[in-house]
Amino acid sequence: MSRTYYYMRISTAEERGKQKFTRQEKSIQDYCKNQNIEYDEHDVFKDDCSGKTFDRPSWKSLKSRLQAGDTVVFKDISRFTRVDTKEAYEAYMDLMKQGIRLVFIDNPIVSTDYIQELVGTAKKSNIITETAMESTVKLLLIVELNRVEEERKNISKRIKDGIAASEKKTGECRKGK
C-alpha cells in the first residue's frame, strides 16, 4: 500500500530560533486538507540542517522507507535540496524512476505528476518527439533546481557579508543594544 510522507527542512539560525517548522507544517497541513489526505505525524520527517547535501539524518531515514507508489510532500523544492544542479537533477530523476511521487506545493510545475503528465500529453498527441520532451523536462527541472542552488549561494554570501560588516577592524564583533 502506498504511503504519503512529509518532509520539512530548516537550515538558518533565524528559522531555528523563530519560526522553526511552523510555516512548512501549516502549508503541508493545508495541502492535506485540500486534497483530502490524512495528515499523520508519524509520516513527518524533519531535518534541522543545510540542504547543500543529501547527507541529512531524517532525509536518509525517509529515503530508506520509500517504495514505488509512495509520495513525498514538500512545501517547495528548496526544502528537497540545495545541492548542485546536476546532483539534484539526478536525485529527482532517480526517485521518479523508482515510482516515488514528489509533490512541491509552491512549485507544482516540478512535481512528478505534472512532469509525467507533460510527457504523457506529448506522447499521446505526437506534438514533439519523446527525446525532445525529455530534453524539455530536463530543462524545466534544471532551471528550477539551479534557482534554488543559486539562492543557497546568495544566502551564504549575504550571511558572510553581514558578519564581515558587523565586525570592527580589529575583528571583534560589535555588541548589540
Task: Name these PLM-found stretches.
Residues 2-16:
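Short beta-strand segments enriched in small/hydrophobic residues
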Residues 33, 66, 96-97:
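Anion (oxyanion) recognition and catalysis
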